[in-house]
Amino acid sequence: KIRSLIDQKSKRLPIDLHDLRHYDQDLAADLLDRPLDFVLPFQEVLSEVIQTMMDPTEFQKEVDLDGGALNEIYQVGFEGSFGPNHVTPRGLRAKLISKMVCVEGIVTKASLVRPKVVKSVHYCKETKKQVKREYRDAMSLSKDGPTTSVYPTKDEHGNPYQTEYGLCVYKDHQTVTLQEMPESAPMGQLPRSVDVILEGDLVDRVKPGDRVRMIGIYRALAGTSSGQTSGIFRTVIIGNNVLQIGKDVGGVIMTPNDIQNIRAVAKRNNVFNLLSRSLAPSI
C-alpha cells in the first residue's frame, strides 16, 4: 500500500480498522477513544517509512511544500467498522467528543476551497533578517494547542516586515454540511446536520447531493466574546477520510485487458463502421 501511495503521488494512506484489530485489538479500541494520541504518531511513522523508500531529493521537496512538519507531510485515513461510533448526525452526543466517529448523511452545502496559512515568512529590509511564523488553530491535531493568530507586521524595534508570499506555506480548507438522510430521520422530525472541516487532499471530494460516510474526530470549539464564554460549544468533525455510499453501484470496472483492447480498436481506420455494426447488428 505504501509503495502504491508513492507511485500514485498520493498523500493519504487508507488503513482498515479490521486489519488494525487483527494486529492489536487494544490499539484499535484506543484509537477510536483517543485519536488525538495516535493519529499524529501514525503519520510521523508513515513519513519516516516513506522517507526510506523515496528518493531523498523528492522527499525533501514534499517536506518543503508542507512546511517541514514530519507528522503532517503524509496522512492516514481510517475506514472499516467503527462499532458504536458509527452514527448519523442525530446520534452525535457529548460522549463522542474527542473520539473518532463515522457519520453517514447527505452533503447539503459545500463552501469554496480557500487557502489557510500554515507558515508565513517575513523579511525586514532595515535589519536584513528573515522571520518565520507557524500557525495552528483549534482544528489542529497537535497537542501544543493553537498559536496566536496575530500576523506580524513589524519587529520589536518598529521596523516594518515585508511578507515573502512565495515562501509562505498554505493549506486548502473547506467546510461542508452533512445532513441526516431522510430515511434515517424519525417521522415528523426535521433532519439534523453537522459541519465537517476538510483540509488538504480531502477538499472537493464531495458535492451537494452526495451520500457519504465522513470519518473524523468530533471536536468542540469554544466561542468567546470579550474573553468570556457562555459554556455552549460549537461542535464540528475534523475530517480524516471521505467514503462515497453507492457510488460504484452499476459502474464500469475497467481491467488492463479492456484498456489494451480499447487502444487497439482506436488505432483502426474503420472504427465508426465497427461501432455502428456493434450498436445495431440486427437492423
Place the predicted regions along the sequence by residue.
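Long, low-complexity, serine/threonine- and charged-residue-rich intrinsically disordered N-terminal tails
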Residues: K1-D210, I215, A220-G227, G231, ...
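Interdomain "pre-motor" coupling segment immediately N-terminal to P-loop NTPase/helicase cores
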Residues: R211-K267
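Detector for Asparagine
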Residues: N71, N85, N159, N240-N241, ...
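Dynamic helix-loop-helix/coil hinge segments at AAA+ ATPase domain boundaries and subdomain interfaces
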Residues: P89-R93, V249, P256-I283
